[in-house]
Structures are given as structure tokens and as C-alpha cells.
Amino acid sequence: MSFEEHLKLFNIFHFKSFDEIENFAYSNWPKPTRDELKFLNQREKADPSSGFIDNLKFYSAVGKSEILQSLILSERYGSYESSSNFVIESLNGFKTILDIGCSIGYLTTYYALKIPESSFIGIDFSFESVKKANNMKKKLNLNNIDFIVRDMNKINYPNKYFDCIVDTQSIYYSKDYLKTFNHLRKILSDNGILITIPGIGEKDLIKQYINQIQNAGFSIINFKFIETINLGEKEYLPTITCSLKKPKEKINIDHVINKLFN
């Protein structure tokens, strides 16, 4: 099954423009409810500066509504495709993998299908999203994956439990990066890696984010930007791979960032 076919199971589609979304909506979606129209008209978004409750309300609303789910997630199709390609290339050899902020499970289930020899745990703080993820797990007959409702700062697994931790634009919404990275460091094995792909497009914010990773005791072993296209617009996603071990060769963070922004 291709990535595009897989995401269609979650009503996530590859649109090239907002006009394509609008035309598809009129032809395929039922009439929105009053609450859905209010949500769409206000164009509410999850925001790193918002509190836990506000972001929970946002993702719960998306998790409850098929229309909102399809619209909001389809807008970022390109990011999901580029991120998944990068993550799958990085997961080879790891047996126990944690996916943080799994939403309705569209990426976690794809990883589990592509790497059946590994076991996956997907966590999200939205009950509605996790419920949908578990339903899709059953539909796909996946036995190497579990979805649970959990805050990323309260993951109650034994120390050094996971070989790999994957984050696709979720830690970015944490109110306290250092607290989150310190917590994740405890549950990552000595030889494991943390892959984080934050939704950050500003030079200084990327540097601040990486500084907090390093302050938590991680070393950066790979850092690069991957190109993606969302609704016809080109973007570059920072991909940061971290380890608890010192790298053989230090990554020049400023050089990588300046190469893109200058």
C-alpha cells in the first residue's frame, strides 16, 4: 500500500491548493454542522503559545469531526509524506518505538505496516484521536502497535524502555522543551535515538529548540532540512536526530541553518 493510499483510509488527501479542497468538499462532504462552520470560519489553530487546555480542545474538535479531520490534516499532507520517508529510513534495527503526538494514528500505523518486526506505541493527549487510532489499528489488523492516551511529560514506562522515540511536530507544542526532553531522556535506551521534526520555520527559534535538546543531555548526530510542498507552497522541515552518546563528529548547527536561511 502506498503512502497516499494509506492516508486515504484516514480521509487525508493530497490537494495542491485550497481550491481543490473546496471543490472536493462540495462534492464529497456532508453539510457542516454549526460548530464545524464556526471552527472553519475562525480557522482556529493549535499554537505553541497556547495552554494545554486550548490545544486539547483544538485536537479534540478535530478528532471528533470527520470534516475537520480531513480538512486540517490534508492541509499538511506534504509534511506527513516527507516526514514519514525520513523516519522510516531512520528506524532500521530499532525494536521498541514510541511515537509522540500520534493523533489518529495515520503515521504510526504506516510505520507499523512498513516495519512489522518492530513494536510501536503511539501516545496522544486527545481521547477522541486515540479512539480513532485504535479503530484503524483493528481495521488494518495490526498486532505490533498500541495506542494510549498520555501526556508527553507523563509517559510512565520504565527507564531506558524505548530504542527510538519519534516526534513529528508535537514536542514543539510543549510549554517547556527542557522538561519534555529531560523526561524523554529517561525512557530512551543508552543506544537509542530521538527523532524530532518540529514545525519551526524561524532561524532563531530553531536554534533555541536545539539548545534545549542539548541542555537536556542529548547530542545531535544528524541535522538537516527536508523539502516538502503543502498546497503548492514549498517549505523546509528541520529534522533533528539525537543520541545520548557523543557523536564521532560534531554537527555544525549554525552552518546547516545559515545555509538555508542566508
Q: What are these model-derived regions, one by one?
A:
Residues 126-128:
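Conserved SAM/SAH-binding beta-strand->alpha-helix loop
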Residues 178-190:
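A short glycine-rich, Lys/Arg-flanked "PGG" loop and its adjoining helix->strand segment in the class I
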Residues 1-52:
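N-terminal auxiliary segments of SAM/dcSAM-dependent transferases
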Residues 76-93:
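Conserved alpha-helix/loop element of class I SAM-dependent methyltransferases that forms part
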Residues 192-199:
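Conserved beta-strand signature within the Rossmann-like core of class I S-adenosyl-L-methionine
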Residues 153-165:
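A short acidic, Gly/Pro-enriched loop at the edge of an enzyme's catalytic core
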Residues 133-134:
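Conserved SAM-binding loop
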Residues 104-116:
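Conserved SAM-binding loop of SAM-dependent methyltransferases across substrates and taxa
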